[in-house]
Structures are given as structure tokens and as C-alpha cells.
């Protein structure tokens, strides 16, 4: 099984701290409207009870076992609901389906990049490298800024 995680927002101070090396990293905005396998892109379900799959589930595999495992990949504790997460979940069967040519081409995701957002603390060298990399593309580059009036982030376009 392969899982890729995405969020509906790029303005969460907490997520920049957790997932972008304390605001030194970056966030990528994708446009998945033309994604071939978007039926596998689902919102995460935030719940207070754990979604249960027995530890010895391999002993109980049935034709529907794949669905149970797939479904389990879409659950997360309600504590994380601020993430507004979506997951692209592909099973081994999906990955070998002829429609996907043996496996999902990871590099093809580049075609869906709309923008790159640099963290508040991203270095100037990192900014230069990102701007150089996307110079001849339609990808927009932004730097996140902390609001002076409240606890929020705003994106300022730099390229």
C-alpha cells in the first residue's frame, strides 16, 4: 500500500512547525483536478475511537480485507482535525493495475504543482534555489509572513 498525504490549508502555524522543519521548509500547492486516479484521493475521517484491525488480520484475510485496510488508512484522531488532511491511498492491486502502467509515476506529480510556499524562516539560499528551479515554469513562488496584527500567516508572492 502507498499513501500520500495532503492538506486543504497552507496557513496553519502548527503544521508549519510540525512538517516544515519549524517554518524553514516549504509547502507545495497542487491542482489535482486532472488527476487520473483521483478516485483514490479521500478526506481523512477524524474520530475519537480507534479504527480497529486485528493484529493477526493476515489470518483472517478475505476478499474484502483490502477494503478494511484501505479504510483504516483514512482514519486519524480527532485531535488532528485542524490539518484538514486528504490521503491518496493506493493498494498493491491498484499499483499493478494496467491502467497505471505497473506503478504510479511519482515524478508525474510535478505536472500538478501550482505553487510553492516557503516558510517564514526559510533561508535566502533556499529561496534562491527554489526560485531558480521553477524560473522557467508557470509555478508561482510565495514566502509565508507572520501577520503583525494576529496569529496568522499570509502568503506574499516573490516569483
Which residue stretches match the model-derived regions?
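Catalytic-core loop-and-flanking beta/alpha module that positions acidic residues
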Residues: 1-159
Amino acid at each position: 500500500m502507498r499513501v500520500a498525504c495532503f492538506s486543504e490549508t497552507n496557513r496553519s502555524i502548527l503544521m508549519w512547525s510540525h512538517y516544515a522543519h519549524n517554518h524553514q521548509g516549504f509547502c507545495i500547492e497542487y491542482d489535482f483536478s486532472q488527476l487520473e486516479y483521483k478516485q483514490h484521493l479521500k478526506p481523512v475521517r477524524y474520530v475519537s475511537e480507534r479504527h480497529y484491525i486485528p493484529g493477526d488480520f493476515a489470518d483472517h484475510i478475505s476478499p474484502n480485507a483490502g477494503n478494511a485496510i484501505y479504510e483504516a488508512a483514512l482514519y486519524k484522531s480527532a485531535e488532528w482535525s485542524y490539518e484538514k488532511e486528504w490521503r491518496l491511498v493506493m493498494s498493491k492491486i491498484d499499483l499493478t493495475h494496467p491502467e497505471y502502467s505497473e506503478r504510479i509515476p511519482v515524478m508525474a506529480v510535478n505536472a500538478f504543482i501550482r505553487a510553492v510556499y516557503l516558510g517564514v524562516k526559510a533561508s535566502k539560499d533556499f529561496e534562491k534555489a527554489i526560485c531558480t528551479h521553477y524560473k522557467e515554469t508557470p509555478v508561482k513562488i510565495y514566502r509565508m509572513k507572520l501577520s503583525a496584527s494576529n496569529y496568522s500567516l499570509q502568503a506574499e508572492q516573490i516569483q
